Amino acid sequence: MARGGDTGCTGPSETSASGAAAIALPGLEGPATDAQCQTLPLTVLKSRSPSPRSLPPALSCPPPQPAMLEHLSSLPTQMDYKGQKLAEQMFQGIILFSAIVGFIYGYVAEQFGWTVYIVMAGFAFSCLLTLPPWPIYRRHPLKWLPVQESSTDDKKPGERKIKRHAKNN
């Protein structure tokens, strides 16, 4: 029986986390299926007079998962250490370059606004280049050590050496 954090529709025999019983609608027996979740709001709206209120939480169904989010979750998100260093250097270099160019152009044109626009464009460009995990940042993957069996079970407690640290006076 689903409780509180369930993502599906609640059927007539289910209760919420607070213990309140769900509303039983005619024609629904057992837990609601996906097809019932799609037609349930229409049934409820037809049975009541129209009102600006939305459906109670017990009768609402979860929104379908968009296909784009499923595609985005399959993209790799890791970045190796050398890639992180490269991304940081590129970010700082682009920001510094755009700040210098923006300052010079703004000084020559006597328009501080152009300095701000050029620095903002440099920031946006550096974010575009460094925030997504592009393949250039994943060229040096980490080599993990193989899992080793722990050998501490074989030693007896008396065989271990006790390390003593020198006292600092």
From Swiss-Prot:
What spans does the record annotate as topological domain Lumenal, numbered to this chain?
Answer: 115
PTMs?
May be phosphorylated.
The gene designation is SPCS1
Outline the segment boundaries, as ranges, of region: (Microbial infection) Interaction with HCV NS2 and HCV E2: 110-169
Give GO terms for biological process: protein targeting to ER; proteolysis; signal peptide processing; viral protein processing; virion assembly
The record's similarity note reads: Belongs to the SPCS1 family.
* Region feature ((Microbial infection) Interaction with JEV NS2B): 91-169
Provide the membrane topology annotation. Answer: Multi-pass membrane protein
- Tell me the subunit arrangement: Component of the signal peptidase complex paralog A (SPC-A) composed of a catalytic subunit SEC11A and three accessory subunits SPCS1, SPCS2 and SPCS3. Component of the signal peptidase complex paralog C (SPC-C) composed of a catalytic subunit SEC11C and three accessory subunits SPCS1, SPCS2 and SPCS3. Within the complex, interacts with SPCS2 and SPCS3. The complex induces a local thinning of the ER membrane which is used to measure the length of the signal peptide (SP) h-region of protein substrates. This ensures the selectivity of the complex towards h-regions shorter than 18-20 amino acids. (Microbial infection) Interacts with hepatitis C virus (HCV) proteins NS2 and E2. Interacts with NS2B from Japanese encephalitis virus (JEV), West Nile virus (WNV), and Zika virus (ZIKV).
GO cellular component terms listed in the entry, alphabetical order: endoplasmic reticulum membrane; signal peptidase complex
Q: Which domain of life is it from?
A: Eukaryota
What function does this protein fulfil?
Answer: Component of the signal peptidase complex (SPC) which catalyzes the cleavage of N-terminal signal sequences from nascent proteins as they are translocated into the lumen of the endoplasmic reticulum. Dispensable for SPC enzymatic activity.
Q: Which InterPro entries match?
A: Spc1/SPCS1 (IPR009542)
Q: Which organism is it from?
A: Homo sapiens
Tell me the compartments it is located in.
Endoplasmic reticulum membrane
Q: Which residues lie on this side of the membrane: Cytoplasmic?
A: 1-93, 137-169
Q: Which residues cross the membrane?
A: 94-114, 116-136
- Keywords recorded for this protein, A-Z: Endoplasmic reticulum, Membrane, Phosphoprotein, Transmembrane, Transmembrane helix
Protein name as catalogued: Signal peptidase complex subunit 1
Where would you say this protein principally sits, based on its record? endoplasmic reticulum
- The ranges of region (Disordered) come to 148-169
